[in-house]
Amino acid sequence: MSARGTFDVALEGAVFACVQVHPGHEQAFDDWYGLDHFYSGGVLGPAVLSGKRWFADRRLRESRFVSDDCLHPDPRAGNHLAAYWLTTGGLHGFFSWVRPQLALLRAEGRMFEARSHVIVDGYRAAWPLAHTASSSVDPVAALDHGFGGLFVSYGEPTGAPPVPAEALPPHSLGIVFAPAAGSLDNNSVQTPPGAPGLAFPTASGAAVMTMLFLPARPSSDLAWSRRIAVELSRASGTAPLWGAGFYPIEAGSSSHVARMS
């Protein structure tokens, strides 16, 4: 942000919040997140360009790619996902703001306990993923474009150079992210010290996330998930660990709620 208080229109990073809503609390969660926390804990923060929500029903969660090397303790958890794009300076500005903001919301009784954190972290945008017939949508506009679905993958860096992908869905858009260290800690989200649910765990301590915005809904087929995850790992120079599809949530609609259980 400049001295005049204006913002660049650029993608510096992202806030990624994947949680598992506890059974029987889906509607209450949706009311809370969709009409309060999405804004008070996200969109209204400094340097936020945009935000978007997705969900995963049971079939999608069961069709996730999970490698033998995946260290996540519950890789099929996560039925709700929110992401926020951050402009230049946003990684520092947003997380400096959100830590006390969460404490304030908690003091006002505006948090929701019937959910478990699965992956909640901040990421720095690394590069747009190159692949055949990629979407022409600028990554800055990805959350607002109206893509039909999302596939998220995690991989562990191997040192191998990225290879342009050749077998991803036409007109999809891939963006590679690296973790932004120190974004959140257990104290920020009120979980016990060392409890899982923040950064994606890997043997080396490093994880690369790729978000692939899809022109259509993701398949609930395990072979499809495996193929996409492996292709994304090659294109990001990583060993594939985890890959998951998500359906978009329409703002103001609750049609997805019954499918979250």
Name these PLM-found stretches.
Residues M1-S261:
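Macromolecular interaction modules
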